[in-house]
């Protein structure tokens, strides 16, 4: 009996060993073919002696706490080149700002890289079925809820909604004194986007904001703050309590789900009663993103997560764009004067139309340049889901390919690619909107809204929203004067901003 059992165990182990050997051989063959086909060579390595990657973690954490993470990124690329390898907790990680590699990861070899493992743990608690928390078929399904809607910006861009937001903003701007525009921009965009997304705004600029909406807005802000913190702490975030974070996520989800169910009930009632008219509140909801998504699905959780995704991603990106733009305009009087003259000459002092905004060429240059100098998302990451490669960065001269093993992470830095003198000239660190006259950004690693299949679907809507607010402010105020002598200091959240805000005086 024991002999038969021993023979069976031996046979099983033998077969297992053979399978392992065959798989190992096949993997070596695949890797060999990749190396030969793309001339792969090892890139330069940051601290090759730091085998466990502990020094890297210490250094990165120190720079993050000292608010010098971005200057450190620039220094590392200057030292090791546009692509280099490092180790973080024994894992080999690749950093790149080479436009060729960025396009490769986001576009050419999109299917070789996943995003969810990088950020799913951040977004899943608040949008478990949203596009930032999933990959593959589930990602395609979640993204499809937005695709057709955002492809028709003229149809969904509500000019009156934008004007209402501006009127709420203007009431908060004092005459004859300095003020920080950054928190006002955040409130403006949150109010407009929540009204667009749900048909009912969170009213953060209003004096009579309800307690419920105040709690939801605060919960949303807190959740985003913790998501940003945990994103930069990486695995270390598990050492910190997330109890309050989870509670904030539930507050946001519960409120949005209540709005979703209310709209679904109203739809069903109108369908059954054949009601010809609706009240003002319902009319607003029928024009909202929520209502348009409900035209495609009745999955409550999918709709809820789609709406919450807009509240998270859409709010921070537009608020960051506005704050960065006005920070720079306050320090470049010539640009502000030129932009104001274009607006007055082509639009006048009346609220702009959709076509007015689309034709504001110099304004688009200003936004492009602001997002180039201070990228909204200074770095991002993808994880290889198979053995693959990068087209550049290997070898002594950095012109060979780089082998990327399955499970290894590639971190690409728009902070580096947007500020590259090779792409944007010797004055790449200067704010000069005129550089965009005739400049094609496709091959320059310019990715303020990402690129490829994961490109931001709402980028045109975001630009329209930021444009409307900017035009109305510049129409109203003759001058924008800087009132802050402090240098720009990084504040890395879900989007990049200046820690010191936008302290200015707006002069009629």
Swiss-Prot record:
Instruction: Report the EC number(s), separated by commas if there are several.
Output: 1.-.-.-
**Signal sequence residues:** none
Needed cofactors, names only, are: heme
Please give the start and end residues of each transmembrane region: 5-27
- Describe the disruption phenotype: Fails to produce fumihopaside A, but leads to the accumulation of 21-beta-H-hopane-3-beta,22-diol.
Listed A to Z, the keywords are:
Glycoprotein, Heme, Iron, Membrane, Metal-binding, Monooxygenase, Oxidoreductase, Transmembrane, Transmembrane helix
Question: What GO terms are given for molecular function?
Answer: heme binding; iron ion binding; monooxygenase activity; oxidoreductase activity, acting on paired donors, with incorporation or reduction of molecular oxygen
Pfam families attached to this UniProt entry = p450
GO biological process terms, semicolon-separated:
small molecule biosynthetic process
Residues modified by glycosylation: 66, 72, 495
**Biological pathway:** Secondary metabolite biosynthesis
**PROSITE patterns from the entry?**
CYTOCHROME_P450
Question: A single GO CC term, please?
Answer: membrane
Gene3D superfamilies from the entry?
A: Cytochrome P450
Under which main EC class is this enzyme filed?
A: oxidoreductase
What's the protein's topology in the membrane? Answer: Single-pass membrane protein
Q: What is its main location?
A: membrane
Q: Where in the cell is it found?
A: Membrane
Q: Which residues are in coiled coils? A: none
Which family, according to UniProt? Belongs to the cytochrome P450 family.
Q: Which PANTHER family match?
A: P450, PUTATIVE (EUROFUNG)-RELATED (PTHR24287:SF17)
Function per UniProt: Cytochrome P450 monooxygenase; part of the gene cluster that mediates the biosynthesis fumihopaside A, a hopane-type glucoside that enhances the thermotolerance and UV resistance of N.fumigata. The first step of fumihopaside A biosynthesis is performed by the squalene hopane cyclase afumA that catalyzes the cyclization of 3S-oxidosqualene into the hopene 21-beta-H-hopane-3-beta,22-diol.
Q: What is this protein called?
A: Cytochrome P450 monooxygenase afumB
What gene codes for this chain?
afumB
